């Protein structure tokens, strides 16, 4: 690679992002697509993929926190942006002036937003969250919750853009609980309509429901992990969407040395060579998001072959056994997460080792890691965060 970046990088294929989004569009038809780009677009880089998502099917974006929304607005993104989580009221002027749509689940908060908006001569755009069974944020779908939402809808400085809930088990085979959640939301919405309140954008379907439950699409859907090419679980109907991971994590060999039998590698002396061995050091560690839990368990791809990670992953480096691979040298390219010529070690494989989910693996890739964007197999953008 001729560009000047640190020898650890994540390659993101924008053509794959585009194709994944087109697949989602084909599945959901004319429903509005809210592309979730929180956590730096699940590690893919929100600033640099937002336009690709919007050009290929999404009409809205969703983030978790105000600074994520600000970053997109500052970059010139004009599409509607929804904040899925909590924003302190001292950011109210920012929300209103930048037309950022805030999730609301508290009457007093809504009143404060309304007051700020009236002072500015504008409307605060909001989505009202209903807790149908996640046990997280949101009004409960009971009479008390209904009265609170009706009060919010009457506030003069507020424009209620959306009503939504979040499914907790839509990616599981048994959909019983998801149907219960969906029924609670639709019944709550009917009660609102019976009181003369008609909210334009009702949304509930997350990635699991998008794949398996078209009857839950309502007015719009929220796609997260599937935009980036990963399925939310092994229990969804994968045949409904043809997805491909867009991100490959790479590095270059930093050093190669031979060790005699009975020599130790890395902290704690957890690995000892059983024979004369060739060991390659890679300049990536847990500070980059390459977890210490991968120590002695992960694989990498070098010269078309797997090599095992040995010893403990360090903060900035790790070691792999390349005894069986000929002519490994400093500068050779290494795939830590991805696929090449039929060999695959991806976020699902890492997640299984670490006892977590593919979402977390992607989000762990830190800001120390440059992102390199490709279209038509050519580099079109490099993002160095630090």
UniProtKB/Swiss-Prot annotation:
One of its GO terms (cellular component) is cytosol. The active site is at residues 38, 267. Its EC number is 5.1.1.1. InterPro entries: Ala_racemase (IPR000821), Ala_racemase/Decarboxylase_C (IPR009006), Ala_racemase_C (IPR011079), Ala_racemase_N (IPR001608), Ala_racemase_pyridoxalP-BS (IPR020622), PLP-binding_barrel (IPR029066). GO terms for biological process: D-alanine biosynthetic process; peptidoglycan biosynthetic process. One of its GO terms (molecular function) is pyridoxal phosphate binding. The keyword Cell cycle does not apply. It is an enzyme of class 5 (isomerase). Keywords: Isomerase, Pyridoxal phosphate. Signal peptide: none annotated. Its cofactor is pyridoxal 5'-phosphate. It catalyses: L-alanine = D-alanine. Substrate binds at residues 136, 315. SUPFAM superfamilies: Alanine racemase C-terminal domain-like (SSF50621), PLP-binding barrel (SSF51419). The modification N6-(pyridoxal phosphate)lysine is found at residue 38. Pathway: Amino-acid biosynthesis; D-alanine biosynthesis; D-alanine from L-alanine: step 1/1. SMART domains: Ala_racemase_C. Catalyzes the interconversion of L-alanine and D-alanine. May also act on other amino acids. Belongs to the alanine racemase family. This is Alanine racemase. It comes from Clostridium perfringens (strain SM101 / Type A).
């Amino acid at each position: 690679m001729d560009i000047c970046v640190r020898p650890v990088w994540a390659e993101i294929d924008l053509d794959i992002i585009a194709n994944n989004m087109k697949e989602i569009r084909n599945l959901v038809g004319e429903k509005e697509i809210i592309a979730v780009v929180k956590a730096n677009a699940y590690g893919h880089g929100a600033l640099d993929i937002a336009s690709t998502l919007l050009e290929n099917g999404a009409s809205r974006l969703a983030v978790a926190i105000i600074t994520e929304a600000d970053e997109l607005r500052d970059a010139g993104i004009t599409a509607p942006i929804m904040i899925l989580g909590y924003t302190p009221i001292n950011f109210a002027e920012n929300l209103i002036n930048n037309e950022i749509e805030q999730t609301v689940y508290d009457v007093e908060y809504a009143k404060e937003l309304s007051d700020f908006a009236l002072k500015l001569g504008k409307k605060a755009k909001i989505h009202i969250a209903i807790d149908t069974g996640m046990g997280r944020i949101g009004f409960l779908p009971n009479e008390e919750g209904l009265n609170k939402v009706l009060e919010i809808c009457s506030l003069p400085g507020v424009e209620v853009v959306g009503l939504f809930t979040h499914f907790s088990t839509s990616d599981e085979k048994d959909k019983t609980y998801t149907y219960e959640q969906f029924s609670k939301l639709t019944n709550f919405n009917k009660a609102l309509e019976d009181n003369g309140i008609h909210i334009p954008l009702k949304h509930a379907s997350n990635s699991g429901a998008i794949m398996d439950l078209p009857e839950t699409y309502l007015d719009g859907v929220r796609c997260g992990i599937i935009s980036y090419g990963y399925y939310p679980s092994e229990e969804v109907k994968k045949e409904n969407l043809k997805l491909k991971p867009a991100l490959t994590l790479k590095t270059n060999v930093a050093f190669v040395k031979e060790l005699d039998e009975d020599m130790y590698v890395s902290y704690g002396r957890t690995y000892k060579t059983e024979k004369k061995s060739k060991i390659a050091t890679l300049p990536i560690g847990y500070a980059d998001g390459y977890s210490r839990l991968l120590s002695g368990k992960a694989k990498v791809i070098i010269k078309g072959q797997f090599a095992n990670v040995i010893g403990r992953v360090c903060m900035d480096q790790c070691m792999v056994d390349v005894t069986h691979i000929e002519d490994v040298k400093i500068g050779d390219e290494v795939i830590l997460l991805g696929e090449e010529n039929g060999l695959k070690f991806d976020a699902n494989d890492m997640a299984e080792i670490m006892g977590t989910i593919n979402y977390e693996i992607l989000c762990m890739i830190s800001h120390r890691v440059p992102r390199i964007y490709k279209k038509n197999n050519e580099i079109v953008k490099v993002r160095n965060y630090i």
